[in-house]
Amino acid sequence: MKVDMSTSVKDDAQLEASRVRENPPPMYKVLLLNDDFTPMDFVVQVLQQFFHMNREKATHIMLQVHTQGHGVCGVYTKDVAATKVEQVLQYAKAHQHPLQCVMEEN
């Protein structure tokens, strides 16, 4: 008796693909938090360097951080968000600024 495994593998792949479409990975917001010490220009620089924003958008987000206490830098998968947070925190610390960056589920 001959079994056609290619159909079974194909069906499994289609089933897995449909599961992925039904359940996308959870997304996380990366936020910068306001403080009274980090210069506004440094925040703009961080947004441009780590979140690839143009100066206008980075300035807009920086003003949100300044006036509202926090600003959303972007929305990413968990691993990417965690990496961005760590990069920003290390960069701020290296430049002796207390800038805080956190992530929260979207």
From Swiss-Prot:
Gene3D superfamilies on file: 3.30.1390.10
Residue pairs linked by disulfide bridges in the UniProt entry: none
Superkingdom to which the source organism belongs: Bacteria
Membrane-spanning residues: none
BP terms from Gene Ontology: protein catabolic process; proteolysis
A Pfam family per the record: ClpS
Xref: InterPro entries: ClpS, ClpS_core, Ribosomal_bL12_C/ClpS-like
Chain spans, region Disordered: 1-20
PANTHER family: ATP-DEPENDENT CLP PROTEASE ADAPTER PROTEIN CLPS, ATP-DEPENDENT CLP PROTEASE ADAPTER PROTEIN CLPS1, CHLOROPLASTIC
Entry-linked NCBIfam families: PRK00033.1-2 (NF000669), PRK00033.1-5 (NF000672)
Assigned protein family: Belongs to the ClpS family.
Job of this protein: Involved in the modulation of the specificity of the ClpAP-mediated ATP-dependent protein degradation.
Subunit record text: Binds to the N-terminal domain of the chaperone ClpA.
Name of the featured protein: ATP-dependent Clp protease adapter protein ClpS
Gene coding for it: clpS
